[in-house]
Structures are given as C-alpha cells and as structure tokens.
Amino acid sequence: MIILGFESSCDETGVAAVCTERGLLAHALHTQIAMHQEYGGVVPELASRDHIRRVVPLTRQVLAEAGLTLADVGAVAYTAGPGLAGALLVGASVAQALAWSRALPAIGIHHLEGHLLSPLLAEPRPEFPFVALLVSGGHTQLMRVDGVGRYELLGETLDDAAGEAFDKSAKLMGLGYPGGPALARLAEQGDASRYDLPRPMLHSGDLDFSFSGLKTAVLTRVKAATRDGGELGEQDRADLAAATQAAIVEVLAAKAIRALKQTGLRRLVVAGGVGANALLRAHLARALKPLRAEAYFPPLSLCTDNGAMIAFAAAERVKAGLADLREGDHAFTVRPRWDLADIQAG
C-alpha cells in the first residue's frame, strides 16, 4: 500500500509517499525559517497561511518524483497533533479532503510517534525493544519502545525542553533565529571550560529533565558581561555558547545512559530536531562504547519535522494492524495538546 503523508504542525510543510513494502519513495519539505526570522520566532498565523500556499505544490512534486498518480495512493496520513492548532488544521484538512475525494482511509498520526519511529527509515534499522530519546524544541522525553504503539514514558522535562533551552539561550546571546543551530555553529569556535554552568538534575537519580535553571544561569552571565554599558564580546559569546551546549548535551547523554542501564536495553534511538546536534551524536557514541550499546539516528534531513516520518508511522501502524482502514465519514479534529501515552496499542 502507498501512503501519502502530510506534516504541518509548526513551521515546516512536509509531504511524502511511503510504500508499506518498499519504504520511502519520495518526500518534499519547505521550511519557513526565513519568513519567521524577522520576528525572532514562529508566528502561528503566518505559519498557517504559508502551509496553505505550499502543501499542494509539494504534493504534486512528491507524486512526480515517485512516479505516482493519486490513483496509486491507498491511504492518506496527516499529523493530528500536537502542534499549533491552525497549522495542524491545514494538513489535516488537505489530507481529509483528498481522502474523501478518492474514497480512501485517512490516518491521524501523533507527531512524536513520527519522530520516534523515524530512525527506522535508516539502515541499519534498530530492532525492538529500545530506549528512545525524543529531543526537540517542544519536547524532551525518554521512552521505552517495545513495538509500534507500545510506548512507556520513562522520564520527561519538568519545564523547558532541550531545544527550547538552546533557542532561549541563543536569544539571550543575541543570536539569530532559529537559535539552536546558530548556537551550535558558534560553539565550534568557543571554549566550554570558560563558563561553569549548572547541569540541572544530572544527579537526581531519576530520568526527568529540567533546563530552566540553565537558561537562568546563561541570563546571569549575559547580564554580568553587559553591566554598566558593557557588551558580550565575540569570543565571550562563543565560549558561552560552547558551555551551554556542553551542559545540555551532558545531561541528555547521562539520562539516556541511565535509562539504558535501568531497562537493561542496549539500543538507543535519538530523534527530534536536537538529534541533529553533532556534539550530542559524538558524545553518545563515546559514552555508549563501555556499555556495548548502539545509538541510532534518523538521517540528518529527517531530524526536523517532515512528511516522511508521518507517512512512515502510518505505514508501520498499518503493518502492525493498528490503523483503521475503513473510509469513515471524514469528520475530524486536531489535538494541539496530546500525550503520546494516549495512543497505546491495547
């Protein structure tokens, strides 16, 4: 079965075609970074309007690249939540309208399930069970994954997500949007040892996270440097960026390793936008060696929000017998707030 997937939960418009037997056939992605840069963050109304402009051309592009027509499509999938309500409604409306016009089933997918399963698009493909570290701008969670739809929450952030800590710290340093990648690039030129920043909850003994204290510590350093009309010099900014990144990465890696030890598992899947961070990947590669454990990441091109992960998650649900393939009446809703535990498979 060929599934056409749509992602529009925030500031990326993604469309993809996935075959349940052959995997990813084609995907196309448009990012709104340039549009939101002048505002320093995502403007929900602008995001929704841009999704409307982009989704049909991207759909045509994917079908052309895959050598398909709508007659070849057996089901449609879309991100049903969580995310920005207006943005979610664009992808959901297009998917449901297309499904209605072709008498096809429409499958609503949890955004985080898309991220969680996206490393399975790469080779070698991790086998179940595994521990998943989901790290993005809006979420930081550790999950035990025993199969598609079989997820156990092990720990999560109690305040800011890791990606949010990157972005907010970058903003405090006067870096551009999106802050996380800008901070990571600047950190390459810095000396992390110059600033002693906290590692919140590093030794808490549990698998939860907290990054608000780190953000406050960064603010304190910036205020100290700019007191009495001073400014944060270029090298100071690079050093502070390096120290901030090192603190976030150390906590993420330590908690992930603790999760592996507590569960007895030896496979770690890392997904979400922060999963593209080079220091995190390198740090985990070193830290996992003594455990004889392996880390799995999605391709860099699929770390951000994308349609491929949504179509693929739908395909995995179809193969696991967890998708309702009846056509239905195409009445639908979206869920801006949605706990991943709510989609457990029995």
From Swiss-Prot:
Question: Which keywords describe this protein according to UniProt?
Answer: Acyltransferase, Cytoplasm, Iron, Metal-binding, Transferase, tRNA processing
**Which reactions is this enzyme annotated as catalysing?**
L-threonylcarbamoyladenylate + adenosine(37) in tRNA = N(6)-L-threonylcarbamoyladenosine(37) in tRNA + AMP + H(+)
The UniProt record lists the keyword Cell division: no
Per the record, the major location class is cytoplasm
Query: What is the enzyme's main class?
Result: transferase
Task: Please list the coiled coil stretches.
Answer: none
GO cellular component annotations of the record = cytoplasm
How does the cofactor attach, per the note? Binds 1 Fe(2+) ion per subunit.
Q: Which cofactor does it need?
A: Fe(2+)
Recorded protein name is tRNA N6-adenosine threonylcarbamoyltransferase
Q: What does this protein do?
A: Required for the formation of a threonylcarbamoyl group on adenosine at position 37 (t(6)A37) in tRNAs that read codons beginning with adenine. Is involved in the transfer of the threonylcarbamoyl moiety of threonylcarbamoyl-AMP (TC-AMP) to the N6 group of A37, together with TsaE and TsaB. TsaD likely plays a direct catalytic role in this reaction.
Q: Which family does it belong to?
A: Belongs to the KAE1 / TsaD family.
Per the UniProt record, one Pfam family is TsaD
GO terms for molecular function, please?
A: iron ion binding; N(6)-L-threonylcarbamoyladenine synthase activity
Query: What EC number(s) is this enzyme filed under?
Result: 2.3.1.234
Q: Which organism is it from?
A: Bordetella bronchiseptica (strain ATCC BAA-588 / NCTC 13252 / RB50)
Q: Which residues bind Fe cation?
A: H111, H115, D305
Residue positions annotated to bind substrate are L134, V135, S136, G137, G138, D167, G180, N277
GO biological process: any one? tRNA threonylcarbamoyladenosine modification
As for subcellular location, the record says: Cytoplasm
InterPro entries the record matches: ATPase_NBD, Gcp-like_dom, KAE1/TsaD, TsaD
